[in-house]
Amino acid sequence: MKKALRYIDAHLSDELRLEDVAAHVYLSPYYFSKLFKKYQGIGFNAWVNRQRMASAKEMLCHSDWSIASIARNLGFSQTSYFCKVFRQTYQVTPQVFRLQNNANYDGD
């Protein structure tokens, strides 16, 4: 599983498909999916989105990239979908998160 997780982390900006990661670790997609959920506690797509959202938070805090650029850099073809996933994950839009975060840094 570690090899699969390293592959996912190295390819967050790519279109990550379960089938491709399974092939990378020489497992069938079905078996890989079952093992992944067993060991990670969540499904493959949820894990990928969780990793991407963690990276998005870092980029929003520590870069001046546009939200669209961050979305593209994390493998999202549509900025609107990126914003939707971010909001579902953190209950705030990327723009509001960035504004709140910058306000916190300005006060230090």
Indicate where each model-derived feature is located.
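Histidine/lysine/aspartate-rich catalytic loop segments that bind and position anionic ligands
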Residues: 25-29
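Short hydrophobic/aromatic patch on the recognition helix
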Residues: 31-32, 36, 81-82, 86
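Residues within the alpha-helical elements of helix-turn-helix
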Residues: 24, 73-74, 89
